[in-house]
Design a protein with these regions (language model features):
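Soluble catalytic regions of large protease machineries
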Residues: 1, 7-168
């Protein structure tokens, strides 16, 4: 169900890369995977492309929620990646309507200096709270869109899941 959610969402949003391969065969730490084949080399991303990436990343969990009535820890990597994209959109790429066109976070520098006495925030606690709210809102909106896509395409998600089980 999880991987089918990703794949169907990618087919339904406007700005996702085409699905190349879907597998439910466990490999390493992953129970399955959905691979995409970018149509072009990218140096930068449009906001609408990044938002659709969030939707696709969260659609696996949305499919679990819709079909199984519960969610698993299997979406850990999807959530981490989506959260990082959302945070970059807000803090590094100025894609927040509330915070505007400013770079608020030098996240990589903070990681580099972690434990070395450096890496303090370059903004107030109030701004940090706004960042957290903006990232959460973006993630919540993307998850709601993923849920809608899965619910509206329940038959396609089920068919894909059945085919993966039968042919893999």
């Amino acid at each position: 169900i999880h991987e089918s959610g990703h794949a169907v969402a990618a087919l339904k949003v406007e700005h996702a890369d085409p699905v190349d391969k879907v597998t439910i065969i466990p490999r390493g730490f992953y129970l399955g995977a959905t691979h995409f084949l970018p149509e072009k080399n990218r140096v930068s991303w449009w906001k609408k492309e990044l938002y659709d990436q969030l939707v696709v990343l969260l659609a696996g969990r949305a499919a679990e929620d819709v079909f199984l009535g519960d969610v698993s820890s299997g979406a850990k990597n999807d959530i981490e990646r989506a959260t990082q994209i959302g945070r970059n959109m807000i803090c590094e790429w100025g894609m927040s309507d509330l915070l505007g066109n400013v770079a608020l976070d030098d996240y990589k520098a903070q990681q580099l200096y972690a434990g070395m006495g450096g890496g303090e925030k370059k903004y107030s606690e109030e701004t940090a709270q706004v960042i957290d709210k903006e990232v959460k809102k973006m993630m919540d909106d993307a998850y709601q869109k993923a849920l809608s896509i899965v619910k509206e395409n329940r038959d396609k998600v089920q068919l894909m899941t059945d085919m993966l089980i039968e042919f893999e």
